[in-house]
Amino acid sequence: MSDSIETAPVNTPAARRTAVGARRPFYRRRKACPFSGPNAPKIDYKDVRLLSRFLSERGKIVPSRITAVSAKKQRELARAIKRARFLALLPYVVD
């Protein structure tokens, strides 16, 4: 009497998960918000150098999914950029 133990095929999702080490192959860890934390810079409409880091080369506000800014800080950042534009510290469009 031979007890045959069936093993699952290697190409099943469960087998692949254990073979890879239970980690997703293209998983990227979410970056932390650059304005959260102890040494984070304060968002100020007069700090043109800081605000220009969050503008595209065309002068548009870069979305938070690219810059990893939290939703609350993204609203604050957008308000500061718009205020700086109104005061002619930043351009509306770049040629």
UniProtKB/Swiss-Prot annotation:
<keyword id="KW-0694">RNA-binding</keyword>
<dbReference type="Pfam" id="PF01084">
    <property type="entry name" value="Ribosomal_S18"/>
</dbReference>
<dbReference type="InterPro" id="IPR018275">
    <property type="entry name" value="Ribosomal_bS18_CS"/>
</dbReference>
<comment type="similarity">
    <text>Belongs to the bacterial ribosomal protein bS18 family.</text>
</comment>
<keyword id="KW-0699">rRNA-binding</keyword>
<dbReference type="GO" id="GO:0070181">
    <property type="term" value="F:small ribosomal subunit rRNA binding"/>
</dbReference>
<dbReference type="GO" id="GO:0003735">
    <property type="term" value="F:structural constituent of ribosome"/>
</dbReference>
<dbReference type="InterPro" id="IPR001648">
    <property type="entry name" value="Ribosomal_bS18"/>
</dbReference>
<dbReference type="GO" id="GO:0022627">
    <property type="term" value="C:cytosolic small ribosomal subunit"/>
</dbReference>
<dbReference type="GO" id="GO:0006412">
    <property type="term" value="P:translation"/>
</dbReference>
<comment type="function">
    <text>Binds as a heterodimer with protein bS6 to the central domain of the 16S rRNA, where it helps stabilize the platform of the 30S subunit.</text>
</comment>
<comment type="subunit">
    <text>Part of the 30S ribosomal subunit. Forms a tight heterodimer with protein bS6.</text>
</comment>
<keyword id="KW-0689">Ribosomal protein</keyword>
<keyword id="KW-0687">Ribonucleoprotein</keyword>
<dbReference type="InterPro" id="IPR036870">
    <property type="entry name" value="Ribosomal_bS18_sf"/>
</dbReference>
<protein>
    <recommendedName>
        <fullName>Small ribosomal subunit protein bS18</fullName>
    </recommendedName>
</protein>
